[in-house]
């Protein structure tokens, strides 16, 4: 109550402090310059969707379908419905590639999450697809059902045990940016997360 006027610090967690969009798309652009490996590119798309769905869930309409064209970051915004449609399209393409290459792998040195396992990445993609389907259940029940059933009935399936959880092994000075969000405004000696709500400061 002492500070009634809200600060804008909390909005920086996804868009400014961690530079989600610029860093993500510049890395994708550089990746496509050095490899044509379909497994690597499919994994990159899964990571992109995993990151960007949190952005649209936080802010609603975002630049997405046209972003990265000719290296552009500042492009027209898409409706959240269009963004989610694109998510499903990209996940389906990644799932198709990884299902076809499920017994293959990439170098473990290039994969800090699954050690190069294409099959585990495919399970993550299906699980992410299921999560996104549940997100839209009140907006488009028919599509939510279609996407959810498709994910669960996939040849590879979804994550069903902790052994297949996606865990990022931190390296260097950088960790998972979601850790920053969860611990934002966290009081000393607090055993739970912080508070990222507007005016939480």
Predicted regions and their residues:
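Structured, solvent-exposed acidic/aromatic patches
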Residues: 2-47, 51-201
């Amino acid at each position: 109550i002492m500070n009634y006027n809200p600060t804008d610090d909390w909005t920086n967690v996804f868009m400014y402090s961690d530079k989600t969009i610029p860093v993500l798309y510049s890395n994708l652009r550089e990746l496509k310059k050095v490899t044509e490996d379909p497994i690597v590119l499919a994994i990159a798309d899964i990571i992109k969707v995993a990151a960007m769905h949190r952005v649209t869930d936080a802010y609603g309409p975002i630049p997405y379908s046209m972003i990265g064209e000719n290296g552009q970051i500042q492009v027209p915004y898409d409706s959240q419905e269009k963004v989610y449609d694109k998510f499903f399209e990209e996940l389906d393409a990644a799932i198709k590639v990884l299902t076809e290459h499920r017994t293959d792998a990439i170098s473990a040195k290039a994969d800090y999450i699954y050690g190069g396992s294409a099959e585990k990445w495919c399970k993550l993609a299906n699980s992410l697809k299921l999560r996104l389907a549940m997100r839209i259940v009140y907006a488009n029940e028919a599509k939510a059902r279609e996407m959810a059933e498709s994910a669960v009935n996939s040849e590879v399936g979804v994550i069903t045990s902790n052994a297949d959880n996606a865990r990022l092994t931190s390296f260097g000075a950088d960790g998972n940016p979601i850790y920053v969000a969860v611990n934002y405004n966290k009081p000393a000696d607090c055993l739970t997360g912080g508070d990222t709500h507007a005016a939480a400061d």
